[in-house]
Amino acid sequence: MSEALTELASYLGEARGNLIAASQLKYGELTLTATGENLIALLTFLRDDAKCGFVNMIDICGVDWPQRELRFDVVYHLLSPKKNLRIRVKVATDEDTPVPSACAVYPGADWFERETWDMYGVLFTGHPDLRRILTDYGFEGHPLRKDFPTTGFVEVRYDDAAKRVVYEPVELKQEFRNFDFMSPWEGTEYVLPGDEKAKQ
């Protein structure tokens, strides 16, 4: 598999090296890094080229790196059924710089981009309907950002007396505690097949 990916990386470097900022083959997976300006051209080439054939977009996800200037990575996971290969295409962006929508190249990118915007706040230009898909309509913030509080801002619950859903500020019943999960109990010493070899 990695031999085929090595050949693919070499071919992509020769055929469309101007669209690829970096290429990395690690842990048996090929990752291409592109800029926002070259993203759509690269995705179109990967889909249409006979030696590539990445006709399926499996997923789009976000990664938050708060310490970086370009805080977010938008990662496109592609599949070539004919070649039985998977690759990733990465684009770095910040909170204010939108990424071009891949919906024209891969119509299935629609909901994936909505999810990435909903969870991380990454904007996509040219998206036909960029609105929340997983969180509630009035939700504030983007919950998969590393600076989003784990408790959230608002508690949503159904009020049986009012017969409706109510939104209230989060009220913690106790302070945060630091739990020590190390057990004071000593476990049984199990003798597993092959242990005698480890002692030699």
UniProtKB/Swiss-Prot annotation:
The gene is nuoC. It comes from Rhizobium etli (strain ATCC 51251 / DSM 11541 / JCM 21823 / NBRC 15573 / CFN 42). InterPro entries: NADH_DH_suC, NADH_quin_OxRdtase_su_C/D-like, NADH_UbQ_OxRdtase_30kDa_su, NADH_UbQ_OxRdtase_CS. Belongs to the complex I 30 kDa subunit family. GO terms for cellular component: plasma membrane. This is NADH-quinone oxidoreductase subunit C. The lineage of its organism: Bacteria, Pseudomonadati, Pseudomonadota, Alphaproteobacteria, Hyphomicrobiales. Keywords: Cell inner membrane, Cell membrane, Membrane, NAD, Quinone, Translocase, Transport, Ubiquinone. The keyword Cell cycle does not apply. Its main location: membrane. One of its GO terms (molecular function) is quinone binding. The keyword Translocase applies. Gene3D superfamilies: NADH:ubiquinone oxidoreductase, 30kDa subunit (3.30.460.80).
